[in-house]
């Protein structure tokens, strides 16, 4: 559906609205980074798959998504650990707002 960018780590020219609308599909768009796939699965309500994707992404992006997921789960101590690993302050925004912030940031980085 969306081509992989030259680094093979994300989508090419995918907008936020396209990403959000893609969550009606049965599977994530081809070429998503593991961090974005985690957020895609979270939008589908599948925390387990979201967490698995975040765990597979070894970098800062995966740590950020991992932090968000543990905060959403209610595991604040684990979330704080992952925010620190991601180099981000612990988020206090509503979950929807944080999800939007992370998705937009990762789409921008991976375009």
Describe each region flagged by the PLM:
Residues 1-13, 36:
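N-terminal amphipathic/basic-hydrophobic helices that include classical n-h-c signal peptides
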Residues 95-111:
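Terminal, low-structured helical/coil segments at or just beyond the last alpha-helical repeat
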């Amino acid at each position: 559906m969306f081509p992989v960018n030259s680094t093979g780590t994300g989508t090419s020219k995918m907008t936020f609205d396209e990403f959000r609308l893609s969550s009606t599909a049965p599977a994530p768009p081809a070429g998503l980074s593991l961090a974005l796939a985690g957020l895609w699965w979270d939008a589908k309500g599948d925390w387990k798959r979201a967490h698995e994707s975040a765990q597979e992404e070894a970098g800062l992006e995966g740590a950020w998504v991992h932090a968000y997921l543990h905060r959403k789960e209610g595991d604040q101590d684990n979330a704080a650990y992952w925010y620190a690993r991601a180099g981000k302050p612990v988020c206090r925004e509503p979950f929807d707002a944080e999800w939007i912030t992370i998705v937009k940031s990762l789409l921008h980085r991976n375009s």
